[in-house]
Design a protein with these regions (language model features):
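Phosphate- and divalent-cation-binding pockets in alpha/beta enzyme and binding domains
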Residues: 22, 42, 83, 122-123
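Residues that scaffold the ATP/ADP-binding catalytic core of kinase and kinase-like folds
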Residues: 13-14, 46, 123-124
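Short, structured coil segments at secondary-structure junctions
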Residues: 29, 127-128
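Short glycine-enriched loop/turn motifs at secondary-structure junctions
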Residues: 26-28, 66-69, 106-108
Length: 134
């Protein structure tokens, strides 16, 4: 099976918290990991909000990039953006969340969608996604 990580899942690997073990367990049980091309930029943009200490920021960024190097990237091309726009019109999510959902929707099933974003979880479930969260 394939595991699709959104930016919250990608970031949670690098920080202490209950979500970290959820993601690590999921990664250990799946051989193929995917994420939208947006996930890395989104995760890295959040790093300075986690701590003011530059050394800790660098550690988090290194951990995220290390995981990123092992992830298959789903492109955010026009087809993905069109699907994301449709999702955002039909569901109560912001466009950046819809991009992750649209990117995951491009993958052949079965796969699992891992997110800790409370706005994405009900939408992903309503779209028939197998969601992993805490």
């Amino acid at each position: 099976m394939t595991l699709f990580l959104d930016s919250s899942a990608l970031l949670s690997v690098a920080i202490e918290g209950r979500g970290r073990q959820v993601v690590i367990d999921a990664l250990e049980n799946d051989a193929q990991w995917c994420a939208s091309a947006l996930a890395l930029s989104e995760a890295l943009a959040l790093v300075p909000r986690l701590t003011d200490e530059q050394v800790l920021q660098d550690d988090v960024e290194d951990a995220v990039r290390l995981l990123w190097d092992r992830i298959h990237i789903v492109p955010v091309d026009q087809m993905c953006l069109d699907r994301a726009a449709m999702i955002a019109r039909e569901q109560p999510v912001h466009i950046n969340d819809a991009i992750h959902l649209a990117a995951a929707d491009r993958l052949p099933r079965p796969w699992q969608f891992i997110t800790f974003d409370p706005a994405q979880i009900p939408v992903a479930l309503s779209m028939g996604y197998d969601v992993i969260s805490s």
